[in-house]
């Protein structure tokens, strides 16, 4: 998958071809697995009297069906943002058309300077401190007390995460730091989780865990703080444009892509319940239909891309989960917009939100901000922030 981010188009194309071949070789068993687990969920939902395939996840997330429907409708109504962005990317890459393996191609002017660990630490803590000295103070403890492990080492697992442990102790953070701008963002993201977990620990074992839709609030907000600090340091228009584009693609991955995946899941589960076992061709049809709705005609999605539904683990392990990413990202973008409007009064309310953990429902936790999760206008606030970023690079 890493080769899909390679600057060499031939490498990206070869990676896509190999990915398709690998999935195709396992097509029969993957189709069987998807059908079996979809049928298992259908039976469980029937026994538990859930009125729809998504109801169980909504109940787990402490959200009303209306709220989730409003979110999905808001995002799909703004797929035009995706269409406009990839027209920009095609122009910046100098291509006549974008194939699906060009989606993650790096822009030539993206800053490549390596950032050492000390500079990363200073950037993150400065960004946090400009927002809230308390937030920076907590994050500083992760560095000073060795609550964060960053070096790459033999036998160390990949990726990044924050683990809350138990309320009586403190969280730990793991990252694999290589010095890229993206890695600095990852450190900010995981420290956002760490700060959230540290503050929420006072709620104890039963209430410190945050409801899933709000679990990414602190992490994505922390990313935004650092992104704006990094952007301010770039002096070249080309570098600034490329850096904003990279951020837009990250947002697209959590807002629009996850929503399109939700649309695929709906077709799959409803199709399984209405028509019985689904063929691989039918699942690929569902996938291409929902992906093409998102990309429009700005990215060419050939039939070879049709099998790519079969590598998404969330469809199997946590049905209905993916909309939570879009929920969290748009919520943070809207909260950041409120911060820009309110300034200092916002900060105290925000830290109280983090410290509340899971002691109240999402609706109750967001009440101090005057947020109505059932209002289409609320979700449009976050989408408007995305559009404003897009306008800066068009």
Across the structure, where does each feature detected by a protein language model lie?
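Acidic/histidine-rich catalytic neighborhood
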Residues: 107-110, 120, 201-271
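Glycine- and acidic
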Residues: 4-19, 56-69, 102-112, 168-181, ...
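C-terminal, non-catalytic "cap/extension" segments appended to globular domains
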Residues: 62, 91-101, 187, 195, ...
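Conserved helix-loop functional segments at active or binding sites
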Residues: 126, 130-137, 163, 193, ...
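Secondary-structure capping and boundary motifs in well-ordered enzyme cores
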Residues: 64-67, 116, 153, 157, ...
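Active-site recognition of the HExxH zinc-binding catalytic motif
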Residues: 49, 178-200, 219, 224, ...
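Contiguous, non-catalytic segments that form substrate-binding/exosite surfaces or channel walls
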Residues: 9-172
